Amino acid sequence: MAFARFARPTQRFLPFAIGAVAVTAGALYLNGWNTIKNENPKVFIGDRKWIDLELEKIIEESHDTKRFFFKLPTDDSVSGLTLASAVLTKFMTPKGNPVIRPYTPVSDLSEKGYIEFVIKHYEGGKMTDHLFQLKPKDTLAFQGPIPKWQWKPNSFDTITLLGGGTGITPLYQLVHHITQNKEDKTKINLFYGSKTPSDILLKKELDDLQKKYPEQLNIQYFVDKDDTGKFDGNKGFITKDFLAKNAPGPKEKTQVFVCGPPPFMDSLSGQKKSPMEQGDLTGALKDLGYSQDQVFKF
């Protein structure tokens, strides 16, 4: 077999050869750099590392609830969270003991530069006691994401979301994401219970979404008592009879999501067995004939 012989480049061509390589390498580098720049850096990537985020501002939501805005590392950073996922927060007590709690953000998943939470203060709650004494520029440790439910558009004809108190946060995340996706035709029933009209969290955002997507989103509020004299929603609790009349039945292509305080969960679905285990389905939803797989507890 004959092999071709290649002449060694003469000295006078070397600068041009080197220059061509440099230009090509530079073009590849810049192209790669532009590609990297176009991808917003994700903060929470599941590496189990704690990252300190600075508190940017606090806004009063109600008499016992606040919105907390934490700055991400850069203005172009995004959280990296997936739909219906949460993060862990942590601080150390004076005795050196860690206090860790999960929270679901309410900011858009693609929001750049910050992450937002709506958090209620619980008397004697170690984390909320700590959070409610924070001031802008203080930091808090975060880790995530904690995946909850992998949402797939158009998997169900209609979903029913049952929320109580601050349990609205993961449900709001679902509502917001589904309505923003023009390809997702899933219809949504949101039944949300609070102590009083003043305790209804994210009401402006929810009402705006209902006005914008009236054919897709149906919201009904429930309160224990009316402290305004102007409330025109439902008074009392979300009951089995109400669900039987207003939610798709278990024989339909549907899914139910539930999130709220222990008494709320006990009444409708039963509590989770542990943070990672759903536990047995009980309460009103079981009585109505829903299967374990048709109900998800946040």
UniProtKB/Swiss-Prot annotation:
Residues spanning the membrane: 13-33
- Its domain of life? Eukaryota
Q: Where in the cell is it found?
A: Mitochondrion outer membrane
Print the keywords alphabetically. FAD, Flavoprotein, Membrane, Mitochondrion, Mitochondrion outer membrane, NAD, Oxidoreductase, Transmembrane, Transmembrane helix
Q: Establish whether keyword Flavoprotein is in the entry.
A: yes
**Which residues are FAD-binding?**
155-190
Report any one BP term from Gene Ontology. ergosterol biosynthetic process
Q: Name one Pfam family in it.
A: NAD_binding_1
Its name, as the record gives it, is: NADH-cytochrome b5 reductase 2
